[in-house]
Amino acid sequence: SSDLSVQIEAALSPLPGLVREVLAEVKCLGVGDNKNVVAELNVEETSHQEIQVVGNGEWCITMGGRDCSLQMHEQKLLEVSVIDEELVEQLDRLSPEDPRYSGLDTALNTLRKMEAEASRFGAAVGLDSVSTFECIVSDDEHYFMEMNTRIQVEHRVTELCYKLRFTNPEQADDYFEVDSLVELMVLIARHKKA
């Protein structure tokens, strides 16, 4: 091949032979001393979605997702809330024979998988603030990209859909609600266990 930098193959079955071919080609024709080869999964027709995660070091929860696929020059132009309740409501209005049903059902199951993964990840690292768990999504598959352990400017999209109620376990009518992620960060920082 004349282009040693990028080779995209559509099928996985001939992969071992293709890897040997690329390694031999790099060994013979590669420039310089660096003969490293990187193999990446080529994912097409994707969306960029992030899950809002909140934890205090002991517990970790998620607050839905945001689809931030519409971007230009690596800047997000539009963020759309992707929440379980909305997807369930849309599915309830459709019959399973409706052509949109399958796509919504896939989106709901993928969101639930991402939220469960994000919550496990946050709990595993002892997350003690707010973060976003970012993924590339293609149909019913999602691929973890990164965890941003800071507030993001688009956090207001989540705040429009969620608020948290903190209740005294000994007195159900003793509670307060938080609808600001920044306020929640301050509360967690002030009251987390040492």
Question: Model-predicted segments: where are they?
Answer:
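ATP-dependent carboxylate activation and anion-phosphoryl transfer catalytic cores
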Residues: 2-194
